[in-house]
Amino acid sequence: MLNYRKLFWPLCVLLLLRSGLELWQYNLRVTDNDQSLYWLAAHDLAAGRSIPAFVYGQDYNYFVEPWLAALPVKAGLSPVYVLPVATACMALLPFLMFAWYARRNNLHGGAALWLLIPLLLPSGWYIVTAMPRGFVNGLFLFACWPPVQNLAREKLRWLLSGILAAVAFCVNANTLPLAVALLVLTCWPHLRRGAMYFLHLAGAVPVFVAHHFITQHAQQQAGGLLHPKWTLQWTADYFAQGITHISQWLRWLVPGNASLWLLLPLLILLTWLCIYQQRRSLLFALAAVLLVLVLSLGINKLHDGREHLHYPFSRMWLALPLLAGALAERVKLHSRIALSVFAVCAVAACFSIGAPHTNSQAPELPLRIMRIDSLKAKSDELTLFIRTEKINTVVGLGYPEWVGDQQLLFHYTEINSVSAPLFVIPEYERRRTLLSKEIQGKILVLGGDEGKWIKMGEIQRKVNVCGMSGALLRK
């Protein structure tokens, strides 16, 4: 008989060590220009400046990570390094909280399960979930689910469950499968009680109303939106494409990247156990989740991805590992079967140990990837040039060829400069309010062609800075 009680703390330590190792090997060495927006937000918060509800230039994807990073940044740490660490903690916290409360309720096997699930996942999962890009901002909130469900007052529990599920969904829709499963499992014993439905709705409806007005406010901001949210569409063509390429959405979410050949047997085993043990609530939750996941394959937004760590399709289904824990912890499993399942998953996981981390710049990627040490060297060169020439404004042109490099370079230099000049990218400026600022003094323009430079001011001399051609202008 396995003694699961003794596994809890060793598994916690192993999980934290694994996460730290993955951070050190990749996320603290490689970044992209989408992450640079979160640097700016954390830097602004640390300096006491307000930030928008959503990522700059958008009316979706709430800023959550910068708020967690603001205090360390204010203490003097760089947001470039603080944010990946904070985001990795956000990804792990739900697993740790579910495990802690399972242990507290003497469900030691369930606690071990919650810790083993992330431990068995490929390196890609750790890398993707440590990117401050809003991938795990909604799932992170489900760390509050176990303490809410352990409240003694039933009606307060229902009210807070409705609030929590609605907030998580509004923050990021990739939480929907997990929210569906948890709501089914917690509400199942009370299906005939009207108060349960009323209190869940009483919690959820005000959240959706508030989200609507926050979105409207973002849409009415000066300068407009650079990236408005998608108009969601469901089509049979997308659905057929999704079904035939479903492994794209499972990438890095199954031990060893095994995808369907491992997932299907586990799904069949879980279904059989639900039927054999007469777990109707679990069977219904499983069916509801599968329906949500399969139908979602027909939505256009779900197909906005690449087979790449920095823009994965699987970011849409990041709830799957948490779903596995929520469903599997509720079935009774003989220790021999549990060991057999673990052994198969562990063998599969071995295939991803030491797998090479891809930081290559694939041509079809809609963002720029760069090593942080290379970015620092370029930023030092730009900073020296700015100080030497006493530049007041740095303008980036040449969209779309140079915009990723310029965002990374400008944002990194801005957060690391005591008295930074105004940095602006007129053709692709995320902080829309900067477009109304008057450009004055000595201007460094990078990228674009000479015709655009002349329109901005008098050319004093042409330069080449950080591999980009440009000019010094006088307004």
Where are these regions (language model features)?
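Hydrophobic/aromatic-rich transmembrane helices and adjacent perimembrane loops
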Residues: 177-178, 283-288, 296-336
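Membrane-embedded, lumen/periplasm-facing catalytic core of multi-pass transferases
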Residues: 344-406, 468
